[in-house]
């Protein structure tokens, strides 16, 4: 299996548990929507790493892994000099860090975050599956209408469930660091169109701030209206290039369009 796809599937695995045969029950997002209330307020703090303490764990967050055979990236709260942030380190590894959360993208369409890339694996390229690593990614998982899934996507859900006993979300957007691809480049995963990568910029050594309209990006990437967001995560990986990567992540929040 493509290691990049395996990583994203593992994100879905972390979001959900076992379920029955109906296709909608094979979506991790179905259970999350049933379990969680939509976040309210003027601003949704999806990740408040700055409120933590260096060396402690981030409440409500957990790791998702590529496979039992893949080495795992490390995530820890650290002091950055300007506050506490989450640091991800990969050494030929590929795993991420996530939390389950329910957000209405129509009410809070704008995502804001910052990251600082400190080390990049050589030879990465998000447009080439065999080199699709990134020192920094922000991952957004969505619920959706299972009836819209085509035969291939349904087969992928059932196969994944049969092999692992776990589930995937309906769709995923990955906001990715890249130095060689133009900002705004959208790349579909080579195995499923329900995973789309959007390049947001490059740069090494300095903090970069980002703002994206998730509602507009979803429409552009998938050609349909998004349902609720059901998960937010980050990922620092070097599993394809077998190199080293290191990045720091600041807080992640959602707000209405100004």
Model-predicted regions and their roles:
Residues 133, 143-190:
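Extracellular/luminal beta-rich ligand-recognition
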Residues 25-30, 135-138, 195-200, 204-242:
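Extracellular beta-strand ligand-recognition surfaces/modules
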Residues 73-96:
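Short carbohydrate-recognition loop motifs
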Residues 49, 210, 232, 252-254:
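Extracellular beta-strand elements of beta-rich domains used
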Residues 107-157, 161:
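Extracellular-facing segments of soluble proteins and assemblies that are Gly/Ser/Thr-biased and enriched
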Residues 22-68, 151-156:
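Extracellular carbohydrate-recognition regions
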Residues 100-111, 202-205:
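Extracellular/lumenal carbohydrate-interaction signature centered on repeated Trp-anchored short motifs
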